[in-house]
């Protein structure tokens, strides 16, 4: 029987200076049957993505902490009120990736708020600032991102989604590691029927790498022996030329939005692109 991701119920409480989101993941019988302990992936217990339903104009990438078994908590940054799609990525010790989904109504911010995690980020786009294949997308701080693909993208075929990050003189820049990778990408179909969190070609998620390492040692039963990789190992795949390539096979035709997150300096920047997949 096909595995069905568990449901997750979000709630938001507001006080004078915080909007606190709590997310409880349901402990279903099917989930327990395949369950292994949830472990950090790229140093985070969960990667939570919020996408506004009004044309996907607002995008947030947050990192809740686990306060109890399957209960997660995060403070929302200063992002506008409204209805949002919610996607929560979890990783288990046996290498399984799980995405929980829901929708949530975000109330207005109480005033000046700060992210609860320095790696949290959010971005707003519109018809002027979004990009398409072959276009240059202006970023903040004088940077820009070019989507290098120029040929049509066809569903059912693996495509390398290629991007280049440049400075104000259009020279490629070196990228600092963001969550152990030179970049991250999120792809969502306009009807929210498809969601994927991608990493660049040539990189591998730390959880998966630990599982492979355990198998190489013949350790396929005692999962408790798995240990995190040193931070230096996670940072070996750094983009020195500002170029990123994300291999992906779009499952069906339609319009998709792609957010690409990079860290050319001490700040996370997000490029937003749309594509019509044939």
What are these regions (language model features)?
Residues 1-15, 93-153, 175, 179-181, ...:
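Extracytoplasmic/periplasmic copper-protein system
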Residues 15-20, 82, 154-158, 254:
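Solvent-exposed, conformationally flexible loop/turn segments
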């Amino acid at each position: 029987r096909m595995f069905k991701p568990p449901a997750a119920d979000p709630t938001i409480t507001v006080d004078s200076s915080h909007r606190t989101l709590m997310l409880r993941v349901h402990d279903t019988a099917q989930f327990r049957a395949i369950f292994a302990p949830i472990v950090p992936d790229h140093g985070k217990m969960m990667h939570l993505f919020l996408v506004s339903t009004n044309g996907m104009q607002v995008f947030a990438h947050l990192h809740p902490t686990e306060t109890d078994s399957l209960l997660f908590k995060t403070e929302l940054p200063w992002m506008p009120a409204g209805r949002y799609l919610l996607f929560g990525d979890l990783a288990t010790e046996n290498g399984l990736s799980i995405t929980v989904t829901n929708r949530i109504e975000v109330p207005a911010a109480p005033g000046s708020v700060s992210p609860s995690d320095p790696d949290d980020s959010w971005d707003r786009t519109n018809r002027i600032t979004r990009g398409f294949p072959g276009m240059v997308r202006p970023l903040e701080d004088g940077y820009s991102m070019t989507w290098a693909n120029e040929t049509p993208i066809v569903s059912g075929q693996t495509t390398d989604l290629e991007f280049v990050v440049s400075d104000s003189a259009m020279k490629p820049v070196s990228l600092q590691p963001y969550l152990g990778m030179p970049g991250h990408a999120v792809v969502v179909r306009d009807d929210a029927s498809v969601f994927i969190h991608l990493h660049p070609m040539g990189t591998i998620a730390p959880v998966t790498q630990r599982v492979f390492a355990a198998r190489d040692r013949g350790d396929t039963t005692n999962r408790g022996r798995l240990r995190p990789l040193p931070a230096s190992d996670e940072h070996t795949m750094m983009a020195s030329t500002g170029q990123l390539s994300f291999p992906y096979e779009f499952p069906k035709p339609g319009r998709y939005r792609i957010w690409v997150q990079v860290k050319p300096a001490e700040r996370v920047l997000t490029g937003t692109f749309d594509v019509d997949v044939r």
